């Protein structure tokens, strides 16, 4: 996609992440915590009932948020100053709904200390995201460049040069790549659903009105604080999106030549001024931030694995063992994160050149 295409791609992701965090972040934690507590107290029937209530409670929320992203997409892209990203934002909207379903199933399995379905679904999701995203983007690029070679309009626009054709294609290619992301969330959701419905279940998951209210209250009490915390963290990317592109465009309007001299390797002088802000944002978010998120992804898995054990110990009142477990998790997190963070700081250039050698302008 290059820096420009990544700008459109990451614009969609930066809008998607805080809304997805608001809808999804607390679901697996709440379901996992309640499931682990039920199993610790030998209430074997409760986990399926918790899952049923969670699905009934959270799926409408995911559907509403998906519809909200799709309908509000023109407003979002206008306030961030990147209106060409409209297609990418709308393409990622259904992913919120699929993520809600996946989050509930993952919480159910993680609460029972069965990480296999979660791991399988994440492998499926990552594989489909890579394959479908690349295939969709390549199909879009090859088709439209073929139209340019044949002298036909590119994406409905008549162009006179290859650079102009690539500029016109970039937002459509980014939207095509985002379709791969949405398809991958559907694939991960199906993997979890198949795992659940493919295993034997004993007992009934029927639940009365009183039980529905009881479980709903417990789920919301646990989920909402986690969702709020995740929203605050992810809002930083949305604030970046609103401020960075607009500030970069303002900097270009003030000192185009100085900006070109400060980044000679990026080839900014060959671009139109209105494209530079999106290109630089794509380089920042698509390359630098991608590397940055590797460390939190590793450490977050420690918390996911530890949560069922912590909830089980809390339910049994084992405070001493609970404290030792939390200290162990924090210790391992520091041991992993500190050297990785220092290494990334000291070798940032070499890491980017190694992983993105085909994108020297963006590096």
Where are the model-predicted features located?
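Interfacial/gating helices of multi-pass transporter permease domains
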Residues: 1-18, 170-175, 214-222, 245-293, ...
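Helix-loop junctions and terminal segments of transmembrane helices
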Residues: 25-40, 299-316
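Interhelical loop/hinge segments that connect adjacent transmembrane helices in multipass membrane
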Residues: 148-178, 190-233, 251-254
